[in-house]
Amino acid sequence: MTNFVHKTVNGLKSLLDEKGAIKLFCSEGDIMEFLVTFSQDKATLNDIQSFEAKHQLTLPQDYQKFMTLHNGAKIFEILSDGENIGGGLQLFSLEEIEEELKYEDLFEDINGIPIGYLLEECHLMIDKDKVNQGDPNYLYIFESGLEYNPLNLNFEKFLDRYILANGEPFWDWRYYTAENYYRTR
């Protein structure tokens, strides 16, 4: 399998200004400014192997590649009049994943690892069963601690599409047909 996560990350970085900001054309003609920050820390192979041993899993190669580039990131936090008001995608560092896993009640019926947070209420999850079965479609969205929905993607495809969609929830687009789109507005 080819691995292009580094190209996606470097491509996004090349579009950022010196403060890490980017202006993007968004839905319905809006132009918005966002902040993108990548952790300067990198997870070492030893860090990854220790994490894997502790949680009895092998992290997918594309996700490992990202973590060796940046041990965490915040992508498309909204800037309003130059002030960061949050939002976007937070990709956790290995240490932040450990912190999230302390909320055992939230994840008790899920055999997954939370690797990020987005849309103010959703966790991005690596499904351990899918990984153990060798299924490349191992990413899930865990919404509000209630719904565990497959994205049918791996990490690098998710990250690539998330950036291409300017942080919009592209996985929901199929529901917004011309017929029903305007009912939600």
From Swiss-Prot:
<dbReference type="Pfam" id="PF09346">
    <property type="entry name" value="SMI1_KNR4"/>
</dbReference>
<dbReference type="InterPro" id="IPR037883">
    <property type="entry name" value="Knr4/Smi1-like_sf"/>
</dbReference>
<dbReference type="InterPro" id="IPR018958">
    <property type="entry name" value="Knr4/Smi1-like_dom"/>
</dbReference>
<protein>
    <recommendedName>
        <fullName>Uncharacterized protein YobM</fullName>
    </recommendedName>
</protein>
